[in-house]
Amino acid sequence: MAFQQSTGIIMTTNMAAVKVEGLTKSFETGAAVEDLSFEVRENEFVTLVGPSGCGKSTTLRMISGLVPPTQGKAYIRGKEVDRPIGDVGMVFQSPVLLPWRSTISNVLFMAEMRGENPGEYRQRALDLIKLASLEGFEKRYPHELSGGMQQRVAICRALLLNPSLLLMDEPFGALDIMTREKMGFELQKIWSASRNTVLFVTHSITEAVLLSDTIIVMTARPGKVKAVIPVDLPRPRDTKTLSDARFVQLAAAVRDNIEAQWVE
């Protein structure tokens, strides 16, 4: 199978969930991202990968409205992003849980932040906690949970109001390799039940191939789109998928696109 190479937009037939056009972000030290363009389809799980410092996290923050671009525009369902949008959930590398709140209280905090009545979302919070394999830990506090469990609480919190778009910035980066692998399968289960559109950032090629419908490989700083690789593996994916010949081929394609930059 030939992989689509692109420095432009991923074309779609319907309005994209996310559309980025000529996005550039410059700092005093230079451009982190330059003329970046791509699209994410509705209900698609798309992952950004690339060399360290290529602007993956900066891109996510511009799309979320947390950081303004120097040039270019980001759109969510056709609406230009000029401030944080309520229908977008965000998960960071650190779970950022409130230490004085229990698991369910941390999940319900999202409703409070958005001015909603937490009581109306209690059943959804319990359903998400169960889906994330945290049943029985509803009343536990963050210090009583492992790192992986804390991150699952953060994911449940981000999903509480059922955002149509979920942005995830290296959410498993601080976890050990075994916990990280388990979290990948847990996230796949949660996403399969909700089918939110997801834009995910990771340094792990294995994680990217396991989770994604599409992988966007970025160039070294300043970040641009180097390649777009569709992941045509059937779902659900499990531990056997990791040794599947097609999985290995896709992972090699991603790795080759990243490593090619080291010799260019």
Where do the PLM segments sit?
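The feature captures the beta-strand-to-loop junction immediately N-terminal to the Walker
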Residues: 49-51
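Helix-to-loop junction immediately C-terminal to a conserved catalytic motif
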Residues: 64
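Conserved ABC transporter NBD signature motif
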Residues: 72-84, 124
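Short coil-to-helix segment of the ABC ATPase nucleotide-binding domain corresponding to the Q-loop/switch region
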Residues: 101-108
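Conserved ABC ATPase "signature" region
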Residues: 112, 119-137, 189
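Conserved signature/switch motifs of ABC ATPase nucleotide-binding domains
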Residues: 140-143, 161
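Catalytic Walker B motif of ABC-type/P-loop ATPase nucleotide-binding domains
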Residues: 166-169
